Amino acid sequence: MSEVDVVRASEQPFKAVEGDGARGLELARLYRDPENGATFQLARVAPGGVSKRHAHEWVQANWIAGGQAEVDVEGEKFILGSGDSIVIPGGKAHHFRNPGQVPLVLVAVLGPGAP
């Protein structure tokens, strides 16, 4: 038996995340390590959509797979496009916004300790 996990994004359910300032955001968990909680997820943000402003103790690495993102980290803004990445240290308040006309698709890796 192989120890390799294959996860098909097309088979993962997306959950809408609304409230607390979030709108137009959907998340799909692709993998969560059962031992340390590290998580691999896919996010879709509709044009004009935004995630809620939040902070957590684990690092969050993000890769933009498509579209455009405006990322606010502790008040500092970054504009990212397809292929760009940003790593947000634990404890830093942040949120994402899609300023573009097409959906933003990003892949996020949440460090150990993520729920």
Where are these regions (language model features)?
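A short, N-terminal "cap"/entry segment at the start of jelly-roll beta-barrel domains
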Residues: 1-38
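Short acidic-glycine-tyrosine-enriched beta hairpin
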Residues: 75-90
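A short hydrophobic beta-strand segment most commonly corresponding to one strand
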Residues: 87, 101-115
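Short beta-strand His + acidic residue motifs that chelate non-heme Fe in jelly-roll/DSBH
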Residues: 51-53, 71-72, 88, 94-101
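Conserved short histidine dyad/triad with adjacent acidic residue
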Residues: 28, 40-56, 90
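Short, conserved beta-strand element in jelly-roll/cupin
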Residues: 44-45, 56-71
